[in-house]
Amino acid sequence: MTEVQDLHGQDSDEGSEEVVLTPAELIERLEQAWMNEKFAPELLESKSEIVECVMEQLEHMEENLRRAKKGDLKVSIHRMEMERIRYVLSSYLRCRLMKIEKFFPHILEKEKTRPAGEPSSLSPEEFVFAKEYMDHTETHFKNVALKHMPPNLQKVDLMRAVPKPDLDSYVFLRVKERQENILVEPEADEQRDYVIDLEEGSQHLIRYKTIAPLVASGAVQLI
């Protein structure tokens, strides 16, 4: 794995900002996105560019293996690494699809009200999937139940019928960058808010919504 991949950030005033990653750094980015997505209660920002670059990298690796000598131990090792990367990639994408199916009306509402310039939580393909899933769900409800009900009951509010992500759930995290003055909400009404510092390398169990912005920025890693 010697190729270098280019990612395009979205924080440049003059367009996309190019970030050059080695293959090892690219796979590390994928694994971080996978772990965060796996343990976060909500759908996180789409990492479609990382997914595309990893798929390109897998194609390059496959081409290199086809040219390599058969029976070489290095070929077997590289093929095992390819299978590991494919597993992480497919698990990451499956996890996102499961969240879309579980929270689709809330995800689409968040996307509709997303401020200009704010990263999307859906890739273009995921957005199409979510829209089609909602349309099919509404059609199924109408055909199976709603059409048999009185006219005043033939509507369903999916925003109320489908549960929201539980942002109050607790998550384990590892601190990658030291953070100061993190406001923590109390467990009970009689308690007061308090402030904590998160030291680099430390691990914590904390309510997700308290550190959600730090997950998005990459300052902490869910574990």
From Swiss-Prot:
One of its GO terms (biological process) is inner cell mass cell proliferation. The modification Phosphoserine is found at S12, S16. Pfam families: Sld5, SLD5_C. GO terms for cellular component: CMG complex; cytoplasm; GINS complex; nucleus. It comes from the Eukaryota. It is found in: Nucleus; Chromosome. The keyword Lipid metabolism does not apply. Signal peptide: none annotated. Residues 166-223 are annotated as: Important for GINS complex assembly. The keyword Phosphoprotein applies. The modification N-acetylthreonine is found at T2. Keywords: Acetylation, Chromosome, DNA replication, Nucleus, Phosphoprotein. Gene3D superfamilies: 1.20.58.1030, 3.40.5.60. The modification N-acetylmethionine is found at M1. Required for initiation of chromosomal DNA replication. Core component of CDC45-MCM-GINS (CMG) helicase, the molecular machine that unwinds template DNA during replication, and around which the replisome is built. Component of the CMG helicase complex, a hexameric ring of related MCM2-7 subunits stabilized by CDC45 and the tetrameric GINS complex. Associated with ORC2. Interacts with HELB. Belongs to the GINS4/SLD5 family. This is DNA replication complex GINS protein SLD5. It comes from Rattus norvegicus. The gene is Gins4.
